[in-house]
Amino acid sequence: MKLGRNWIACFCVFAFALTTFAQEQEAVRPSGVPEPLAKDSPPKATRARSRHPHAKIKAASTEEGDQVSPPPVSGGVPATGARSVMMVDARTGKTLYEKNADEIRPAASTQKLLTALIITEHGFLDQPVRVEFSDTLAEPVKLNIKPGDTYQRIDLLRALLVKSPNDVARCLARDNAGSIEAFAEAMNQRARELGATHSHFVNPNGLPVPGQYSSARDLSIIARAAYANPTIRSIVCLPQLAFRYANGRTRELENTNKVLRRSPYCNGMKTGYTEAAGHCLICSGSRPGRDIIVVVLGDSTAVWRDASALLSWGLWM
């Protein structure tokens, strides 16, 4: 009988200890919290985020504290009325989209990117350039520089890329090669070196002349080379420029690229228009981890809207 009482007492002590242990375990993991996952088996959402390193990129900002959300990207490539379009990755040259990219067309002032590239690669941008009378024989867009005036090469280059004056293009070209014809040959040689083999240039400004042509694909190749040039990139992104004439007068030049003011992601490049070429534009844009170049040729006045839409689509596709 005494043995039975001892056994009952031991059983009660064991049951009490077991109950206490279970309560302590429940206190460690409150009710409603799921069992922890194994370390080598993360939740599906975590694994998905790890495959998209840009998923948490901050929104672009135009001013401190003024954030611009990424544009929504849905559906296919934005429709445009342009005759030719070429979109490439500025770093790799990979084609992102093309439309009649090999169609031979006049390039208008977009070919001034090649003019600027040759001038920049030649160097000596702090050297003086003296304007000659033949430089001023260009219409219709002019800066009205005067024969005999002297400017630094870099100042003329900035004006060329921001406001696109044709007299400045002639001045830089003649100063570089000795004549417009010699500079045009330099343009064709440099284009071939870059791989733009379906183009032929006759003048440095893009005004219409027989035998001058390019294509959206070739211009994207030239634009990539220009985009890789730090001097050119530092200029084409300027929304405006104060140009100081030789007589001391200052003129504010507004960038002809309206996409710079429409899109916070745009950082250049070059506009163009003639009646034969239509509205043309090469524009570049970037976000963290991505740089693209869009070439639009033979468009209407909708070129700004079209290029902005293509730029956003290409950056956030």
What annotation goes with each model-predicted range?
Residues M1-L3:
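N-terminal secretory signal peptides that target proteins for export/translocation
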Residues T20-E24:
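Boundary at the C-terminal end of the N-terminal hydrophobic targeting segment
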Residues Q25-R217, I221-P230:
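Active-site-adjacent loops and short helices of periplasmic peptidoglycan-processing enzymes
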